[in-house]
Amino acid sequence: METRLDPVDVVVVGAGIGGSAFAARLAEQAPKLRIACLDRGGWFDRRDLPAHRRDWQSLAMTSWATSPNLRLGSGASACSADYPVDDTHSAFKPLMWNGMGGSSLNWAAHFPRLHPSDFVVRSQDGIGDDWPFSYFDLEPYYDLNDEAFGVAGLAGDPAYPAKKSRRMKPMPLGRLGSVAAAGFDRLGWHWWPVDAAINTVAEDGRAACNHCGPCQQGCANGAKSSTDLTYLPQAARNGVDLRPHCVVREIVIEAGRATGIRYVDGAGRDVVQPAATIVVAGNGIGTARLLLASGLDSPALGRNLMFHPAAYVRGMFRQELDGPLGPIGCALYSHQFYETDPGRGFKRGVHLQVTRENPLLSQAARLEQPWGAEAQRLLREEFRHSMAVLVLAEDLPEAHNRVALTDRQESDGMPGVRVEYRMSEHSRRSLDFGLDRAEEMLRAAGAYRTLRVPLAPL
């Protein structure tokens, strides 16, 4: 039997970064509105996070991996709301989390902004479409979001228009970051400490980062910002009805208009929630899945899927670095090659990001020779003696890259979902250019050996 609830003004599907920010801000600006925010997952108790366990490195590759497919494949996913994503025909793998806070629970907390040029790519570069507003129109909202998350950073980055001063100092560079910065300086290239949504000082009842490392399996001391610590408490204070463990199966369409949602709640009951306005914020895969499953048939729906194609170069150094200490993605970055240069043979540019080193078990797991005396030699040579430079490129919208439904029904009662993504020659050229620059920087920083990974399945 189906339960039909009283109507609300706005229902938000998804309590991740987008959905929770929207719900919290709307409730603040329009306190008389009746707002509900649902998520298929639940709340997580920080006492249960892997950082409290001695086997956290193993959990990071299995039940607490960033990919739902790896978590499900472990047979003991830490995220009970996971659903599989068929990525057989995709160059990249899904990284996402379902729960109150969404993927902000296991993100790396790097908090970059777009550049002014990103809003005018059609006018400037003849690709994609221009945005209907500019960077400077959006800038006040960037500032609001930075304030809500508590972004740590350093003002004055010459790659961007002037930003407001951060209320917290940036993450420390450490030995690894200092060595990388020296390499950029020798080449005369831009670099800057990352903006990170991580407390570098204790604030708002949350501790400062202690540089323990397992950020992507949830922050045990709450230093890393996630929306279960920021926007969702604000939303609750402002009267938003937060509903965990609600699997939304369908947008209800009546006479060509969306009138509500149909979902299964945590007790297994079928529920209809009528709403005047429906906001779907279930990430790029989950949103398309729900809309397609609801019978929407726009020819553009699910198509033109875009990632940031990624690759990286690792450099090995004679001196010991402090790579395993601190958030893996929050050392420093370079936008020396961010903008279009017609001489490169591709449009737009690349983002270079110096990342910290993986922990010991992860390092050992990816050795070319995984056992024996040679493995021990390689591990002694590489662990605490390496850094990586991640290359992120800008892909172009292509209709064949898409999210689609499968013929299989999953355990949540919805059709399965698959991702189809072929990397274009344009993306490959931009990644290769970035890999060349990353290797050049590592050599300038003193690396005696480098190793290219031409495609990182992020």
Q: How should each PLM-predicted stretch be described?
A:
Residues 42, 48-59, 63-74, 79-85, ...:
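Mid-to-C-terminal "cap/lid" subdomains and adjacent gly/pro-rich loops that border
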Residues 61-77, 83, 87-89, 110-113, ...:
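Conserved redox-cofactor binding core of oxidoreductases
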Residues 2-123, 127, 132-136, 140-143, ...:
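N-terminal glycine-rich phosphate/pyrophosphate-binding loop and immediately adjacent elements
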Residues 24, 28, 233, 237, ...:
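Short, well-ordered alpha-helices that flank and scaffold nucleotide-derived cofactor binding pockets
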Residues 5-8, 267-277, 281:
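Core beta-strand elements of the Rossmann-like FAD/NAD(P) dinucleotide-binding domain
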Residues 78, 192-215, 222, 249-257, ...:
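A glycine-rich dinucleotide-binding beta-alpha-beta segment and adjacent secondary-structure elements
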